[in-house]
Amino acid sequence: MAIDREKVLQAAQKYVEKKKYDKAIQEYQRLIQADPNDARTLLKVGDLQSKMGAYPDAISTYETVGKLYSQQGFALKAIAVYKQIREIIAKHVPQLEERYGHIAPKLAELYQSLGLTSDALAALDEVATRLQRQQKDAEAIEVFRKIVELDPTNPLPHLRLAEAFSRVKDVEGAVFEFKTAASQLAGLGRRDDALKVLERLLHHQQDPEQARIAAELYLARGQAADGMQALAKLQICFQANPRDIDTLGLLARAFTTIGQAAKAIEVQKEMARVARDSGKTDLFREIVERLLRVAPH
C-alpha cells in the first residue's frame, strides 16, 4: 500500500512543533523505508537527532546523506553535510574523531572535484597531521604525496614529505624531496631557508652536487662564518673529485673569504695545472694571468 507522503509529513511536522522529536523521527522513518535514497527526509531526521542530543545517531544519518549527495553529483551539498558532521564531532563528541577520520579525505576529494585546491589542501593537511600524531607515518606519506601533487611549486609540502620519509628511514625519498624544496626556495630568493634545507639533505647524504650548491649559497651570502661553512661543504666535493675545476674555483673563493690568501693562491695554481692537463688552454691562460696579478712571484 502506497504511503501518503503529504499526510506523513504533516504528522511529523505536528510532532516537531510539540517538540516530540522521537515521534517525528518515527514518521520520517516511514518515508525512508519507502525510499532509502530520500536525502531530504534523512537530513530532517539527522537534524532532529542532533536537537535531541543523539549525536552519534545524527552523525551516522548525516553520513548517509553525504554519501547520497556525492553519488548524485551534488558535491557542494555533500561538503555542507560533511562539514556539519565535523562540527558536531568537534563540539559534542570529540571521542568519535578517529572513527570518522575518513571524512576529511572525502572532503578533500570533493573540494578537488570542484577545483577548490586550497580547501582540498587544508583538508589533506589535517589528515596528514592526524596520521603523524597517531604515528602512522607510512599512511601520512601517501597523503603528503597527494599534497605535493596538488601544490607542486610550493616548497613546504616537499619539505614535509622529506621529513616524513626521514622518519621511516627512506633516505632516497627524503633526499629527493629535500633537493626539490631547496631548489624551489633558492629560486624564490629565500637563500637562508634553502641553506637550512640543504643542511638537512647533507645530514642524510653527502651529495657532492648539493654540497657545491650549498657552498655557492654560503659564499654568495658572505657573512663572517659563511666561508668556513662553504669550506666544509667543498670538502665533500673535493673528496668526490679533487681535480674538478669548479670545485677548486669555489675553494679559492672560500679561502679568500676567510682571509687565507696564500691557500687561495695554492688552489689557483692547482686549477692552472688541471686546466693545462685537460687541454683547456684559454682557461689556463686566464688563471695564470690572474695569478701573476695577485702573486707575481
What label would you give each PLM region?
Residues M1-H297:
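Repeat-based scaffolding regions
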